[in-house]
Regions:
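Active-site-proximal loop/hinge segments that shape catalytic or ion-binding/gating pockets
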Residues: 1-132
Length: 132
């Protein structure tokens, strides 16, 4: 994430990464209405080992405390639990994006300039606390 990890070929850092925020339950409702499969993982979906779930009542299995903390270290599998992911098959409707978080004023301006003039324009905010 800081362009220095030996196992990653990406060296661009976090600045160009956008965070798209949406309401989890609205997305699930949309997916179910449109026969789109969805799932979430209890850890990083890109790892060799992960567990996934696909029922609303299983959301309680997520370690919400780990997900919400700004710390990546500590016991009880915090690092793994923090990497839980929500996945949706094929596509995601742009109109469900409620906010875009960016790292810097430069990226903020680039994103604002790229949003469609006549369409859905979710608010864009510099959210440094969303980055590490």
């Amino acid at each position: 994430y800081r362009a220095n990890h030996q196992e990653l070929t990406y060296r661009g850092g976090q600045d160009p990464i956008l965070h798209l925020e949406m309401d989890l339950y609205s997305v699930i409702a949309w997916a179910e209405e449109h026969n789109q499969r969805w799932a979430f993982t209890l850890s990083n979906a890109g790892s060799y080992y992960f567990e996934d779930r696909c029922k609303r009542e299983q959301l309680a299995e997520l370690n919400w405390e780990a997900i919400q903390t700004n710390q990546w270290s500590g016991g009880n599998g915090i690092k793994e639990a923090k990497q839980a992911e929500f996945l949706i098959e094929r596509n995601f409707p742009w109109h469900l994006v409620e906010r875009i978080g960016v790292h810097s004023p430069l990226i903020y301006q680039q994103v604002v300039n790229m949003l469609p003039q006549g369409g859905h324009r979710p608010p864009v905010e510099v959210k440094r606390e969303w980055y590490y």
